[in-house]
């Protein structure tokens, strides 16, 4: 008897939920099957459920409700992605970049493919605490591709925090209390992926280098991966004799797989293109 009552309670709960999501409408009608149908999508809003001792009619969601639920889920997902992008502190100019929008060339094809595979296999990368070191000359696309990875992950609801060592130091100087600084560090540690842009551009004071090391070491201890971009070469990082820098670079090289970026600066290419376009326009050749 108790088992039967429990079964009835579950059925009643299902029926109540369906009724709440899909209440009757004056325009709804009884179809040839004897069930209530939606006046808009023409689908049943009821279902006959055959039990061992009887048949009961229970409310169900029609296609209109299912479609609305799907739209609500899409809206919630979009809001979550937008929130992740706001929290990521990514520069606005990078928030729409994607692997599909990057101009591919002989020089960057391999780098794009590796970064894309890293993003697509991030669950495994996260499990291994495996990061990336994107290194090479100025303007070769390191920051752009790191942001492509970030956007791919955030579109899949993975939290990312991206900043530079220079900005970290600037932010810390602006905090009014030690608690603010601790909360800032915790945000970096909590993110599923942390992107540190332009390592090596920070001032070489003991304080600055200690902060950078603490941030990187915090990621190491939290077991969460990071991506580091730098204009330094592997030789410069491996051969560094300054102990303050050396321990930073050693930790990065321990955690991050290196990908070299070579070729002509993308920024210089873009500047040259803009120059040519303006020349044609101003000379009346456009």
PLM regions: where:
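Pre-Walker A (pre-P-loop) alpha-helix and adjacent loop at the N terminus of AAA/AAA+ ATPase modules
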Residues: 93, 101-132
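Loop/turn-to-beta-strand initiation segments
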Residues: 158-159, 190-193, 222-228
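Walker A/P-loop nucleotide-binding motif
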Residues: 124-146
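Short glycine-rich substrate-engagement loop in P-loop NTPases that contacts/grips substrate
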Residues: 107-116, 127, 150-190, 203-210
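A short, basic N-terminal segment
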Residues: 1-110, 269-286
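Hydrophobic/aromatic beta-strand patches that form the interior of the parallel beta-sheet core
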Residues: 132, 161, 195, 227, ...
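Walker B catalytic acidic pair
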Residues: 198-199
